[in-house]
Amino acid sequence: GDPVLNQYANEIAGAKPRWIGYLSTVGVYGNHDGAWVDEETPLNPVSKRSVQRVAAEEAWLAFAEQNDLPVQIFRLSGIYGPGRNAFENFRKGTARRLVKPGQVFNRIHVADIAGALKAAMAKPSTRVFNVTDDEPAPPQDVVAFAAELLGVEAPPEIPFETADLTPMARSFYGENKRVSNQRVKDELGFTFRYPDYRVALKALLETV
């Protein structure tokens, strides 16, 4: 579960906050071989860290019901933004184009996480929301687009099978899914500032 809830459940309940948000991960869905998932998709976490997130989500939702408090769960995809993006990898000389056919990743700009949370605070409820952009995309495409914007040659493609990866990095490629963000748009009226990686990288280029 969540150590904050474990330690301070009574204090939180006693304070009767008007809104509670817990930031989780789309990793709770596990692998779906590239198929679309939404908030109603049964959870099937693969990694230990995602199993722990499921336990934390369940604890917060139970806490919400027991105490009649609004708790919103936000399942975030891969976070990027200033200081954490494809350009940084080029700057550090670590940019690689790993290719695993059919593999996509889901992403979210940090500014859109903040925007979604702000929209949610205005509409307290006990609800789960995916916070991810409109376009799950192959990681090698993101690297190639960043290279194009920088005016440099893209790194050569490296087959996933032969790539030198840490166990954690390799584990991310064991999960392949496309995560829907329709609920956060429909129910919170949220409009993404960076609906895909192209829009975001063009904006981030100005900060490089």
What would you call each of these model-derived segments?
Residues 144, 163-191:
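Conserved C-terminal active-site "lid" loop/helix of NAD(P)H-dependent oxidoreductases
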Residues 1-23:
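NAD(P)-cofactor binding segment of oxidoreductase domains
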Residues 195-208:
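Amphipathic terminal alpha-helices
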Residues 58-82:
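Conserved beta-loop-beta element that borders a ligand/cofactor-binding pocket
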Residues 26-50, 65:
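Active-site "gating" loop of Rossmann-like NAD(P)-dependent oxidoreductase/epimerase domains
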Residues 114-117, 122-169:
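Mid/C-terminal beta-alpha module of Rossmann-like enzyme folds, strongest
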Residues 79-89, 98-121, 127:
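Substrate-positioning beta->alpha
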